Each structure stands twice: as C-alpha cells, then as structure tokens.
Amino acid sequence: MSEIQVETKGFHCVDNAVVYDLTESMIAAGYPMRTNTKDLLTTSIEGKDIDRAISLSKATLKGNQAHDQFLSGIRIAFDLRCSNKMWVEAERYRFLTFVSSQSTMHRITKFDLSDQYNKYVDSSIIAIMKQKVAAYNYLLEKDDTNPETLKEKYLEILYSNPAGFELTARMTTNYRCLKNIYKQRKDHRLPEWREFCSWIETLPFAHELILCDA
C-alpha cells in the first residue's frame, strides 16, 4: 500500500495529512479493460495507467459521473481545524468521516478561549464567554454549589458559544469526495472553506484528478 505524507505548512486549517493507495487506485482504474489476472497483481504504475486515470476523471466533466469511481480508493486522512459554522456544513458530506474530534460538550470550560475563536468573533463576546467559564469554574470548586445550578450554568456556556469557535477533528475521506467538495466550496463565502480548497490543490495529482485542469 502506497503512503504519501502531504505538506500542510502555511495552512491554518489542515495538519498531519497522509494519502493512501494513490498508485494502486490509479492502476485499478484500468481493471475494466484487463483480461489477464496476472496483470492485476502489478504495483508498478506506467504512463498508460496515469493517462487512463486522468482521462476517466475528466470524463465526469462531460456528464459521465461513474467513470471516476476509482478516486474513492485514493484515501486521505488529516486533522481539520475549523469553526462550528464550517463543521455544520462539512457534515453534509457522507464520505467525509470523523475519526475523532475535540468536544465542547465535554471540555468547553477547559479550553483556553483566547486560542479557540477565529478573528471574526467580536472581542466583547469572547469576554462574556470567559466570564461565564470563570463563573462556572468558581462554582465548581465550591463544596456547597447546587448540582442543578452547575448544569444550568454549563448549558448557558454551551448555548452561548459563538459560531466562530474552532475545533480540531481527525478526518478521513477520499479523492472522489474531495472532488465534490472542491467543486462546491472553492468560491464559498467562508474563508476557511476557500483555504481548505486551496490545500486540496496541493495534493498529489490534484490538478489531474480532482480539479481536472491538467
């Protein structure tokens, strides 16, 4: 199985990225035209394999949506940091899968809030959130605090938290899903979607297989 470490330097939203099975999946794109079983055992990619894979991926531009199925075999895992606003939209992609993520439900009162909000969150709102967290933690340390009061205060914090709060999650997906994301989000209003799409452009064979502009 091929494994490629992907550069993420210069991108705020992505880290620790690895691409798997790029070579194997590009070779497999030619399976429908092969009749000799021994031909399927090769792990050495040739120019004709690359050309066919690129041609099949570009065929979707003409409406042949099934021809790029092999892209689903090119898997990629990465850490994604983005706002609650972007996470809500990211969850619509069926094949963009959460491995694990940070949690406001469990740890909202433990975060350093100064590092968690993007630049679009009003500083006065951040100050209010810090006050609410400080008040909760103060009550938590007191022996005589009513448990129901703590529950209510915690819910106040959860529901008051603005959309610009950023969380990091380990994600896994494939090139076919990224192709769909890129098409739909490259000019999105949210800058973090645009940054993510800019990072997609740097992936191995991205221009040939995802953007289809090469």
Please tell me what each predicted stretch does:
Residues M1-A214:
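Family-specific signature for flavin-dependent thymidylate synthase
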